[in-house]
Amino acid sequence: MCGIVGIVSQSPVNQSIYDALTLLQHRGQDAAGIVTVDDENRFRLRKANGLVSDVFEQVHMLRLQGNAGIGHVRYPTAGSSSVSEAQPFYVNSPYGLTLVHNGNLTNSSELKEKLFRRARRHVNTNSDSELLLNILANHLDHFEKYQLDPQDVFSAVKQTHQDIRGAYACIAMIIGHGMVAFRDPNGIRPLVLGKREENGKTEYMFASESIALDTVGFEFVRDVQPGEAIYVTFEGEMYAQQCADKPTLTPCIFEYVYFARPDSCIDGVSVYAARVHMGQRLGEKIAREWADVDDIDVVIPVPETSNDIALRIARVLNKPYRQGFVKNRYVGRTFIMPGQALRVSSVRRKLNTIASEFKDKNVLLVDDSIVRGTTSEQIVEMARAAGAKKIYFASAAPEIRYPNVYGIDMPTKNELIAYGRDVDEIAKLIGVDKLIFQDLDALTGSVQQENPSIQDFDCSVFTGVYVTGDITPEYLDNIAEQRNDIAKKKREKDATNLEMHNEK
């Protein structure tokens, strides 16, 4: 899962992109990068491992000159954590092209071989984002002309859609031309468009979430539609075209459960409101199914994604709502940390209990989901150590039983605590007295309350049904082998830092 930003302006964009990336930091804390186009049509790039605030110092910001640029925060699901795989990526032909990407391609191996045979293009890393950039570059190269028109750009995106499968929201810049943003035909990963008027001219911005627009003074216009491409010239002219044959909106349900900020709006859905609805429905289920609900003394969220959900549950059950955990905001989100050992060590560094809220009480803990069970088990241990008598646990998402292949680090079914287990077995493993999960129809219904036009979602982690229709058991076995923690460590050890000029 990553966050992406692109701005075409009439004034320097370095600070605006930086500010937008800080607002998308929750989508990835592994690496960050910005590339701008200066007055001499040169790319200015800075990317490195770390948080946005660590990667960009004043000297870097001063060198990132230009009125157009793109940015990225990374959480790796493919490839390694090497800085050589940080984004943006760059190719010098045709024109000079750079790209940022959020998502995951599901036919990377096939594409890499095909690209080399067809175009003699070498992809130097294991990143599917570099591969995607080269696919797009190859299609743009076919026009063999000095100046592209918007239709040429749309044609290249259309051919790219035909080649690649999976989830992808992308923003690319073409030297001497402009910026193009496009979204996969299923709309799995989010992408929004914003604009602002400056000195009588319109400036445009793309971002993974609407919150990134708000803070830098851009007005939300709309979501980029599934399969659509929007092209903005560096002079500020905007063009849009549907580039997929059969687009359909099936957004990832986990965006609303976990990834997106509550103050964002994605595909016509207020993330905050959707989470309140999740709390309403889960609270009603608890009241309906638990005979001992009166024994609950207090409702406590596992911060921060579940705060709004837990507050609504407390109101439905007519129970006190308390903040029993204090979060250290300078530790990354544990679920999206690569490596089980790092996830385990970070939980206790991230959270601390307020003992008075637990001592001698029957506590209902509320979390957005239970993935590996790492966080849940340790949180329960902390609650017991703080003096809780009984611990009930409610998950705002159903049981996660299947791997994700569209950009979330759930690569192996054996890493998922719910795989092959029922609710009682999961409860025993994480150490709670009672456990309840949200029903899938209640979860999807919570989001549809905000936008009834969304007919379906990617719910593959709950159902095992993958919306792209190309996922086989062999593919799942392959990514399990490639993406387990041992394989990740080996790639990081072998990684070589080969990249274009980086503003040190």
Swiss-Prot record:
Function as written in the Swiss-Prot or TrEMBL entry: Catalyzes the formation of phosphoribosylamine from phosphoribosylpyrophosphate (PRPP) and glutamine.
Catalytic residues, chain numbering: 2 (nucleophile)
Catalytic activity as recorded in UniProt: 5-phospho-beta-D-ribosylamine + L-glutamate + diphosphate = 5-phospho-alpha-D-ribose 1-diphosphate + L-glutamine + H2O
Name this protein carries in UniProt: Amidophosphoribosyltransferase
Lineage top rank: taxon: Bacteria
Domain Glutamine amidotransferase type-2: 2-235
Keyword flag Transferase: yes
Organism expressing this protein natively: Pasteurella multocida (strain Pm70)
Residues that hold Mg(2+) according to the record: 305, 367-368
Family per similarity comment: In the C-terminal section; belongs to the purine/pyrimidine phosphoribosyltransferase family.
Cofactor note: Binds 1 Mg(2+) ion per subunit.
Enzyme Commission number, as recorded: 2.4.2.14
Top class in the EC scheme: transferase
Listed cofactors: Mg(2+)
Keyword Metal-binding set for record: yes
